[in-house]
Amino acid sequence: MKTTLASSPPKRPIEWRKAFSAMRRLIKNPDATDEVFTIIEALSGNSLQKGFSRFVTTDLGREILVDRRSLLETLLNREYLATLPQHSLAALYLNFVTKENIRAEGLVAPSEGMRAMKNLDADTLLFANRQRDMHDLWHTLTHYGRDELGEVCLLAFTCAQSPNRGLAFIALVGIFQLSKRYGRGVYGAAYRAYQDLSLIHI
């Protein structure tokens, strides 16, 4: 299979008003995951297309597209994950989601309202879903928890791996809000998360 890219995809608008409205709702209700995706869609611009362009330059990326590998399907197959070696990423991930009582499809429903996802070609959609479904794998690799500070630090780390204006906005607002409660050390923790690949523990 040969993957082709549009030479210059139309530039998607940045919708700050929409993002700020969603952010106000998210601050009032931090569990409103759908607002996270509203902010990401409002501010991402062409981040997804840029990430996909990088993805298809790698051998592994092209292999994933050829094989139509769904990360979500793999993560949902707990029987298979349980057969893999004890200290593998699969085993660590399975232990994490079991302990936290969460499932891999937890972000699917909140992301379904994103208009931009509805018009993607099959390859870009597979990549976009893979980006979404990486979240709990990043938790596993970095050992950041699902508490507020852990999530903010994980967002900062994710921004370093996949630059995205929407994720950065959520992370910065989260850092500011947490610093009012816990002090300026929150800034240092988030900055370390952003810059330090040694946080990956496996």
Task: Report residues per predicted region.
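Residue-level signal for secondary-structure boundary elements
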Residues: 31, 35, 63-64, 101, ...
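Long acidic/polar interaction regions in large eukaryotic complex-forming proteins
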Residues: 59-139
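The feature captures two recurrent sequence modes
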Residues: 1-79
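Short coil/turn segments at secondary-structure boundaries
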Residues: 35-38, 65-69, 105-112, 149-153, ...
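Short runs of predominantly hydrophobic/aromatic residues within well-ordered alpha helices
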Residues: 16-19, 36, 48, 86-90, ...
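Conserved binding-pocket/active-site segment within a compact domain
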Residues: 123-189
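Conserved small/polar residues in nucleotide/adenosyl-binding loops
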Residues: 200-202
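Mature, well-folded catalytic/scaffold domains that follow N-terminal targeting or propeptide regions
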Residues: 10-17, 24-28, 56, 99, ...
